């Protein structure tokens, strides 16, 4: 087994705002082999959430975020980090859609194409990713080169059946990294006609089930939960 050492680098990217709540965060994980010769493998995890179709920066006259944010700027930042780091995992926690005319006119095509160009590894779905309905989301998937991981949404009775994953395992520098994705309760938050027959399952039960599966069956060295639940959550 290997020892996991976590190094938080929030100071490097304290407040890189994409939208009203979106943030690119960076963390580094160092795996140290328990042998006489201590070989260190560094994994860098980049994470975004709530991008809400903000392709361009805010207006330079904006009182709160002058000339800040936007997927174009974040793409440049990601490229800068890729030049310095070798083993990168780029993830998104949902609410990619809704918030600017880009979504109203192009229905998600622009967002998915940009994220594909940025080489995202995976994303989960937020409530606003249902804003064009299940069929609308499915129609945009050909523009995404990355998978959507939805561990607690059951799409078996919808057109999204077999178009998302429950988890995904990534291999980085000889390490197995398991990623699962958790979504929010849709009932009462999203109109029923938009999510259709999607079955919502308890996020805590699903997260623990897949974490156990990834750890014990698939022998992952690290497990990451990409969650759209926020810091404090209850669906009761």
Residue ranges of model-derived segments:
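Acidic, metal/ion-coordinating pockets
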Residues: 2-236
